[in-house]
Amino acid sequence: MTTALGIDIGGTGIKGARVDLTTGELVSERIKYPTPEGGHPGDVLDAVEALLSDLGGKAADHTGICFPAIVTHGITRSAANVSADWIDFPAAATFAQSLERDIHFVNDADAAGVAEAQFGAAQGVSGLVIMLTLGTGIGSAFLIDGTLVPNTEIGHLEIDGSSAERRASNAAREREGLDFEAWGLRLTRYLSHVERIFSPDLFILGGGISKQHDEFFPFLEIATPIKPAALLNNAGIVGAAYLAGNALLD
């Protein structure tokens, strides 16, 4: 069995596990730490180091880390719901040096999309699949015939005078006390806008709230088919591990 470690850094939590790269299944306990207040790189690095120790990770393990930012060549180019210190930060090199292992850094929604393409709801789907992760913000991944187009960031599209994630993320639902019907109307407004621009063949909705898709899918009224993420909130972990295992084996 070939495995790799996947770490998913979010605005509120950092979680990780060992992943079977053939099946996409977690083959260890999933461990979660709270994201340190302020989300500064050094503090997050310390939390990741502790998490890897809990997982029994070794320097030889392929290790992927997904993060809520545009990531190019291992450098985080933006910062969503974390410290601005991440902007233009050499994340992969810094983490690799401190953790004494090769690190593959990737955008969190892109990792989730790759996981769904390899093992989940987008497996074998042709055409354009748009995956949206509904959490602290709205992440996005575009997959064309299963191939990732990275760093799309369409959660920042403007809807009704505000960014989509300010109005339609799961955090917005919780912050404003919206019931699922009211939230579904906001999601429909956003999804309809995305649909008009990109004409996707399938939407996949992920993030922790996807476990409750039966509660809000009935209120989503768009023409494009919609599926919940098959890997639920583990998709980032699985995708990060898969990308690390394949990138570092090349």
Tell me what each language-model feature is.
Residues M1-H62, V71-I75, F95-E100, A115-I130, ...:
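ATP-binding/phosphotransfer module of carbohydrate and carboxylate kinases, centering on a glycine-rich
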Residues I138:
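Basic- and aromatic-lined ligand-binding clefts that recognize polyanionic substrates
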Residues T76-D88:
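A charged helix-plus-loop insertion that forms the helical arch/lid used to bind
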Residues I103-D108:
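General beta-strand structural signal in soluble alpha/beta enzymes
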